[in-house]
Amino acid sequence: MRFSVLLTGLAAAGSIATAERTCGAVPPRAYEKEFTEALNSLSPEAASADLTAGITIDTYLHVLTSGQTGNIPDSQLQAQINAMNQHYSQAGVQFRLVKATRTDNANWASGRDEAGMKKALHMGTYSSLNIYFIPNLSSGLLGICYFPRANPSQTTIIMDGCMVRSGTVPGGETTNYNQGKTATHEVGHFLGLYHVFSENGSCVDADMVADTPAQSKKTSGCPSSQDSCPGGGVDSIHNYMDYSYDVCMNQFTPGQANRIAQSWRAFRAGH
């Protein structure tokens, strides 16, 4: 899933003065069918696996730089892990930082040669999370991540994970998006979550989660309230899977937590 920013003025490299998130990709074709089939194919033992102790995900952070552009100190990398652990505590998920790497490569730091970069840097298994922090993602993107797939090939495993704009880490220079919540949003896709809003402007159950009301449009900024589909509850403007400013995001729902657990069992546990 892709986040992008629409610039409204000139900004220094790696920083954004004013921006709005937009999306440049959609989930895989017929993904909900794949999701359901993967769940139904689980053994009784796997389907009923006890996750009351939560899910702990081995996490690898990769910092891509072009000279000094894009460098992130260890303190901010740890702050990003801490932020994700705080955000996902509502969903029973925690992230264990296994290793952080730094690579000076101007091509990769500009978001080019994704396959070559991941072939060189990817670590762990399909149950591991790799996040690549890139200062200049193409087209002003804030982040890109991939949904989990059934029976992943070796190529799918290597291409898995998230690419996130470097300036969105806690204390980064991307105005309105520098509390680490871009990574939190992107990892939601890694765990099988959709956006809470409809991609085509309709008032349908776009995210397959019962306790997020129908929402026909993304949220911009941080409004006091928004109700794009009257009658079913106000929009989920504070949800991590909307497009609000970081300061506005503070919620995963129990339904989303349940979908994360289902997704983990179906696609990533044991891989």
From Swiss-Prot:
Residues 1-19 form the signal peptide. It holds the Pfam family Peptidase_M43. Disulfide bonds join C222-C248. Zn(2+) binds at H185, H189. Keywords: Disulfide bond, Glycoprotein, Hydrolase, Metal-binding, Metalloprotease, Protease, Secreted, Signal, Virulence, Zinc. Its EC number is 3.4.24.-. GO terms for molecular function: metal ion binding; metallopeptidase activity. It is found in: Secreted. One of its GO terms (cellular component) is extracellular region. SUPFAM superfamilies: Metalloproteases ('zincins'), catalytic domain. Glycans are attached at N136, N200. The active site is at E186. The keyword RNA-binding does not apply. Belongs to the peptidase M43B family. Secreted metalloproteinase that allows assimilation of proteinaceous substrates. Plays a pivotal role as a pathogenicity determinant during infections and contributes to the ability of the pathogen to persist within the mammalian host. This is Extracellular metalloprotease TRV_06892. It comes from Trichophyton verrucosum (strain HKI 0517).
